[in-house]
């Protein structure tokens, strides 16, 4: 199985809208994430025009579109990026596709674009995503208790981070 990530293109819009609206994907995505065609188009266009500060990437498995993930700059001076919007189509789940895709995005952001820190936040009820973050090398850094209103219920946000030196140590580079 070959997994690769690539920057999303306008030709990916139908796939992205369908994936982000899928009944098995949508409940786990942050409310602020664009799902409508115009919002997704704006994100893809921004990713293409601001590649160092904003990105939407398509995950492919053996050449087939399988998912999406993204980043945006959180702090330019300190070189911090927020990661988010990871979604894998249910047909590709259970194969650790997201783990390999996350590693590729980490290497791109840290070694190619020069970010120092990558961070993400996951809903407390999303145990699958938390396990993925830990498998992908992220360190659990804390919990924002009852931080988000999801359909009238307060849920926690679990914070994860990865530093350049974490990835360098893993890769065996100084």
Residue ranges and their predicted role:
Residues 64-67, 128, 154:
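Glycine-rich acetyl-CoA-binding "A-motif" of GNAT/NAT acetyltransferases
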Residues 2-4:
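Extreme N-terminal starter segment of soluble prokaryotic enzymes
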Residues 119-122, 139-155:
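Conserved catalytic-core motifs of GNAT/GCN5-like acyltransferases
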Residues 111-121:
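Conserved GNAT acetyl-CoA-binding A-motif
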Residues 146-174:
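C-terminal "cap" of GNAT-fold acetyltransferases
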Residues 7-11, 21-93, 108, 113, ...:
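Acetyl-CoA-dependent GNAT
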Residues 88, 94-108, 127-135:
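Conserved acetyl-CoA-binding loop-helix of GNAT-fold acetyltransferases
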Residues 113, 135-136:
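Structural motif
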């Amino acid at each position: 199985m070959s997994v690769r990530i690539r920057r999303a293109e306008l030709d990916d819009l139908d796939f992205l809208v369908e994936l982000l609206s899928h009944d098995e994907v949508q409940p786990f995505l942050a409310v602020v994430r664009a799902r409508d065609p115009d919002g997704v188009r704006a994100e893809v266009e921004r990713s293409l025009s601001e590649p160092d500060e904003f990105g939407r990437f398509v995950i492919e498995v053996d050449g087939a579109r399988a998912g999406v993930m993204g980043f945006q700059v959180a702090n330019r001076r300190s070189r911090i990026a927020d990661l988010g919007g990871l979604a894998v189509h249910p047909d590709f789940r259970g194969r650790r596709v997201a783990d390999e895709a996350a590693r590729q995005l980490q290497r791109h952001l840290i070694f190619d674009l020069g970010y120092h820190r990558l961070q993400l936040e996951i809903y407390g009820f999303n145990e699958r995503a938390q396990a993925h973050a830990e498998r992908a090398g992220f360190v659990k850094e804390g919990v924002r208790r009852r931080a988000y209103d999801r359909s009238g219920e307060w849920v926690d946000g679990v914070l994860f981070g990865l530093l350049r030196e974490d990835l360098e140590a893993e890769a065996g580079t100084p």
